Curated annotation (Swiss-Prot):
<dbReference type="GO" id="GO:0000027">
    <property type="term" value="P:ribosomal large subunit assembly"/>
</dbReference>
<dbReference type="GO" id="GO:0003735">
    <property type="term" value="F:structural constituent of ribosome"/>
</dbReference>
<dbReference type="GO" id="GO:1990904">
    <property type="term" value="C:ribonucleoprotein complex"/>
</dbReference>
<protein>
    <recommendedName>
        <fullName>Large ribosomal subunit protein bL20</fullName>
    </recommendedName>
</protein>
<comment type="function">
    <text>Binds directly to 23S ribosomal RNA and is necessary for the in vitro assembly process of the 50S ribosomal subunit. It is not involved in the protein synthesizing functions of that subunit.</text>
</comment>
<dbReference type="InterPro" id="IPR049946">
    <property type="entry name" value="RIBOSOMAL_L20_CS"/>
</dbReference>
<dbReference type="InterPro" id="IPR005813">
    <property type="entry name" value="Ribosomal_bL20"/>
</dbReference>
<dbReference type="InterPro" id="IPR035566">
    <property type="entry name" value="Ribosomal_protein_bL20_C"/>
</dbReference>
<keyword id="KW-0694">RNA-binding</keyword>
<dbReference type="GO" id="GO:0005840">
    <property type="term" value="C:ribosome"/>
</dbReference>
<comment type="similarity">
    <text>Belongs to the bacterial ribosomal protein bL20 family.</text>
</comment>
<dbReference type="Pfam" id="PF00453">
    <property type="entry name" value="Ribosomal_L20"/>
</dbReference>
<keyword id="KW-0687">Ribonucleoprotein</keyword>
<dbReference type="GO" id="GO:0019843">
    <property type="term" value="F:rRNA binding"/>
</dbReference>
<dbReference type="GO" id="GO:0006412">
    <property type="term" value="P:translation"/>
</dbReference>
<keyword id="KW-0689">Ribosomal protein</keyword>
<keyword id="KW-0699">rRNA-binding</keyword>
Length: 116
């Protein structure tokens, strides 16, 4: 009895991956094994960088807060310590947004931290 293979499903699976790799350079877009490896590696990078994105944004917020705090004559660590003592629970994302888009509100927050 001859071997039975489901060629339709195999071709559909390969076609699906090759469709996902459109726009890649060279053999990465049309050679099955190269395209599959590239696509899998891309998923690995995506998984890793979804986690790294959170670290990068936190670092960016801290840099922005530090720069704005130093314009007000305070370091980042003194500002955060003062906010903690004053009982002001405001996260770094919002603080960075205040520093960039609403400097007057940020100055008011810094003033409260200085008093504490």
């Amino acid at each position: 009895m001859p071997r039975s293979v489901n060629h339709v499903a195999s071709k559909a699976r390969r076609k699906k991956i090759l469709k996902l790799t459109r726009g890649y350079f060279g053999a990465r877009k049309n050679v099955w094994t190269v395209a599959k490896n590239t696509w899998e590696k891309g998923l690995t990078y995506a998984f890793r960088d979804r986690r790294n994105k959170k670290r990068n944004f936190r670092a960016l917020w801290i840099q922005r807060i530090n720069a704005a705090a130093r314009l007000e004559g305070m370091s980042y660590s003194k500002l955060m310590g003062g906010l903690h003592k004053a009982g002001i629970e405001i996260n770094r994302k919002v603080l960075a947004d205040l520093a960039v888009n609403h400097p007057e509100a940020f100055k008011a927050v810094v003033a409260k931290a200085k008093v504490a």
